[in-house]
Amino acid sequence: MAKIGLFYGTQTGVTQTIAESIQQEFGGESIVDLNDIANADASDLNAYDYLIIGCPTWNVGELQSDWEGIYDDLDSVNFQGKKVAYFGAGDQVGYSDNFQDAMGILEEKISSLGSQTVGYWPIEGYDFNESKAVRNNQFVGLAIDEDNQPDLTKNRIKTWVSQLKSEFGL
């Protein structure tokens, strides 16, 4: 099976925990390389044909600081032919008007650079007003809400990883 590069940013550790769960659901570190974007360069994304990008929405609809720091550097990455999946951590109750915005901001940027987005996720089961991560009535990736729906996280990850295995062609 091809190596998958999972790049995540985290402020409080929630996104890292989700990333580790995704890695384990895929079968461990022999399949998925975990990369904290705080310790990586944008050019590190070039090493993989399959990418998973994880980012919490921070403050009011903003990118997590480490993703914000390399956002412009993403222009130098060759995303042509890469399949990219996204996951986000957010609070649909406290931040209903910008739930998962960071995931949408990153997907919009990276897809504009030639990648193919995979891993779309249904909006059913969530209660929010607005999100930059919704396209055609679906999230652009897996939406996790550990603040309000922690009991759903494990099953959502399991279902999404199964979907990704198929969409990545693995």
UniProtKB/Swiss-Prot annotation:
User: What upregulates this protein?
Assistant: By iron stress.
Cofactors that this protein relies on:
FMN
SUPFAM superfamilies reported for this sequence: Flavoproteins (SSF52218)
- Please give the function described in this protein's UniProt entry: Low-potential electron donor to a number of redox enzymes.
Q: PANTHER family, per this entry?
A: FLAVODOXIN 1, FLAVODOXIN 2
Span of the signal peptide: none
Source organism: Synechococcus elongatus (strain ATCC 33912 / PCC 7942 / FACHB-805)
Kindly state which keywords UniProt assigns to this record, in alphabetical order: Electron transport, Flavoprotein, FMN, Stress response, Transport
Q: Which residues form the Flavodoxin-like domain?
A: 4-165
- UniProt similarity note: Belongs to the flavodoxin family.
Protein name per Swiss-Prot or TrEMBL? Flavodoxin
User: Is this entry keyworded Cell cycle?
Assistant: no
Gene3D superfamilies in the record, alphabetically? 3.40.50.360
